[in-house]
């Protein structure tokens, strides 16, 4: 099952409301037929900030691979813009999809690309070099967990658990790293045995598959599901089965707790 592409299907409303005494924006009010008993969370950017800054690694790396194949009328600036646009467009899907797109762009320009998995491995090595100190600091306690979490993450997880809600995590990051980083952040205490990530065979995993598994194994319909995410995939997938979608328009860089305007518009469009 392939992952859906981004397609804005909902307009951004001119007016919304805010839940009293919170910064939670209510974009589309709805009546609750039942209290959700299954909560699905995206990982990076929704709960974890360990990989904050990943785009600053990916865009230059992919640009470097595509530049040698630029057409005569394509300036370096135009290639950078192209790469940034498709990386942004595919954010929320598994990393391999951005590498597949790179290979397609090289092929369109008459080049012979490497295997997308090779590009992914190169990117991942560069990213791990950037975040290694964060992971080590979390492991030895020199970096507090709170500094690598989206503000309020553990409070939300604890509140859901107290209300009898089963918690799941699904990420486009490779599963072994999601498991390890969830442990470093203390998230595994809330979702043990229910943390999923990308597989070597990318076609064998998607967030839609995780949602269908939750519904099937628990014999419930989509109304029993609530999903939290800063990516369009989990928002659109949750809405497609009738669940409640909570967009997390997180400011990853400053960790300010304020809304990221670009994420907000994109997530509202997704549902």
Which residues fall in each region the model found?
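Short, acidic/turn-prone active-site loops that include or flank metal/cofactor-
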Residues: 195-202, 249-255
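Surface-exposed amphipathic alpha-helices with a cationic face
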Residues: 154-162, 215-216, 235-246
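Substrate-recognition element of Asp-dependent hydrolases with the DxDx(T/V) motif
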Residues: 46, 58, 142-148, 153-183, ...
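Structural recognition of alpha->loop->beta junctions
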Residues: 185-199, 258-271
